[in-house]
């Protein structure tokens, strides 16, 4: 082979390699949106009678502020900076909703991100290359008990599952009662390439914990087994604990 041609090829390869390294060195810019904390759902178990249909009673409670979503954004921000210290992060605490209803899905069935014009404009303004989206995830009810999982039907988002008939026993005192409350968090963390609006990777979170009615001192109502602050703190703890590994997972190639 002609020596000049060899030198030319070596030079081209060297330039290409240097260019690739320069591209790799460019830090990603992330935008973060959370759409999991606008409401809570109370799910009251209804015994199934010869059917696999979800007969549970679902009651949605709209929350007055974005406190839960704000905490979720902070959890993602911390996890992102641990996974990629060079990352530039923009938290969209008041991102415009998708076109139509505020609760409209932002992902379609083919893993395509479908923002409205206002949201897309807000994302473009940040200069972000990627989006981390926290969205509600619907799946089978699997409430975590000590040695098993309980419940029926399907759950989505954040809320509380209430059962009034299941016999439960406290592990610490041995006291028993019928019924339990189970705070739960069912959500999905998605990494989205904003150049193509395609999902790069998903991670689904299904977190829950059952609390026996036996913990309620003056009531047989499972709802009273936890105070208002305990209910909220358990939901927030799910987000703090489950979000970092979910973010780390979607960041992996």
Model-derived features with residue positions:
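C-terminal/domain-edge helix-coil "capping" segments
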Residues: 22-44, 142, 147-253
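N-terminal signal peptide c-region/cleavage motif recognized by signal peptidases
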Residues: 15-19
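N-terminal segment of the mature soluble domain
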Residues: 46-171, 184-188, 192-202
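Repetitive helical segments and hydrophobic/amphipathic motifs
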Residues: 11-13
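Bacterial N-terminal signal peptides that target proteins for export
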Residues: 1-7
């Amino acid at each position: 082979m002609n020596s000049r041609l060899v030198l030319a090829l070596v030079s081209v390869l060297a330039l290409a390699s240097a260019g690739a390294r320069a591209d790799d060195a460019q830090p990603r810019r992330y935008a973060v949106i959370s759409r999991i904390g606008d409401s809570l759902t109370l799910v009251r178990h209804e015994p199934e009678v010869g059917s696999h249909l979800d007969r549970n009673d679902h009651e949605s409670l709209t929350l007055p502020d974005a406190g839960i979503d704000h905490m979720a954004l902070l959890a993602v921000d911390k996890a992102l900076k641990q996974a990629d210290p060079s990352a530039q992060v923009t938290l969209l605490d008041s991102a415009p909703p998708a076109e139509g209803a505020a609760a409209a899905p932002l992902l379609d069935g083919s893993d395509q991100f479908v923002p409205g014009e206002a949201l897309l404009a807000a994302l473009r303004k940040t200069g972000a290359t990627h989006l981390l989206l926290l969205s509600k995830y619907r799946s089978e009810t699997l409430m975590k008990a000590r040695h098993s999982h309980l419940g029926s039907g399907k759950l989505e988002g954040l809320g509380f599952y209430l059962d009034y008939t299941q016999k439960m026993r406290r592990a610490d005192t041995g006291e028993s009662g019928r019924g339990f409350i189970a705070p739960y968090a069912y959500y999905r963390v998605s990494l989205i390439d904003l150049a193509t609006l395609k999902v790069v990777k998903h991670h689904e979170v299904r977190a829950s914990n059952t609390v026996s009615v036996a913990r309620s001192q003056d009531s047989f109502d499972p709802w009273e087994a936890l105070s208002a602050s305990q209910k909220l703190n358990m939901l927030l703890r799910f987000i703090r604990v489950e979000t970092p590994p979910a973010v780390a997972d979607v960041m992996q190639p």
